[in-house]
Design a protein with these regions (language model features):
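Hydrophobic anchor residue at the start of the ABC signature
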Residues: 128, 167
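Catalytic Walker B motif of ABC-type/P-loop ATPase nucleotide-binding domains
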Residues: 139-143
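Conserved structural motif at the start of ABC-family nucleotide-binding domains
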Residues: 5-7, 19-22, 148
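Helix-to-loop junction immediately C-terminal to a conserved catalytic motif
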Residues: 51
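Conserved ABC ATPase signature
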Residues: 114-123
Length: 191
């Protein structure tokens, strides 16, 4: 199966405020897209619409393949060790390459530490490992580089490149530069 993600003439409204309209995109296996724009312009709303977690005001989304999403809510139980918190999700998600993702993101030395003691960047890397371990065809990454140091950002870039090389699709929403040579979709505030 070839991954595919497209959106046709999307509009998003929050209350009486129109965040964006007329948004269309089409991504095939190996493609990536960087959605940019200032805070509050609708980047997260677009990601939630693409993931099927929110309905567009108008328009439609078509998807072939499985979707995994990373957002600001990492859903890691702070009362458990990182090992146990990740194991919980690995059982639910059916993660098949979780150990590989833990190693790739430098988490092996942190597995026995309670999540509440991890830094923001360490928690973000754990969330990325959880998401990548799902082996989904389409990755939706909402602000994936927030809180990451230069080495961790390079690790994430490597994971994204490997995912694309295997036919995966990646959509990154961020107001930060990604360091990746991929097309950009700039969302602008509606007037």
């Amino acid at each position: 199966m070839q991954a595919h993600l497209s959106a046709n003439d999307l509009a998003c409204r929050r209350g009486e405020r129109l965040l964006f309209s007329g948004l269309s995109l089409s991504l095939e296996a190996g493609d990536a897209l960087h959605v940019t724009g200032p805070n509050g312009v609708g980047k997260t709303s677009l990601m939630r619409i693409l993931a099927g977690l929110a309905r567009p005001f108008t328009g439609s989304v078509e998807c072939t393949g499985s979707i995994a999403m990373l957002d600001e809510r990492l859903a890691l139980d702070t009362d458990h060790t990182l090992r146990d918190a990740l194991a919980f999700w690995e059982r639910l998600d059916g993660a098949c390459n979780a150990a590989q993702m833990r190693a790739a993101l430098g988490l092996l030395s942190l597995l026995d530490i309670p999540v509440r003691y991890l830094s923001t960047g360490q928690r973000k890397r754990a969330g990325l490992a959880r998401m990548a371990g799902q082996n989904a065809d389409i990755w939706l990454l909402d602000e994936p580089l927030n809180g990451l140091d230069t080495d961790a950002q390079a690790s994430v870039a490597g994971l994204i490149a490997a995912h694309r090389a295997q036919g995966g699709i990646c959509v990154i929403a961020s107001h930060q530069p990604t360091g990746l040579d991929i097309p950009q979709l700039a969302l602008e505030p509606m007037r």
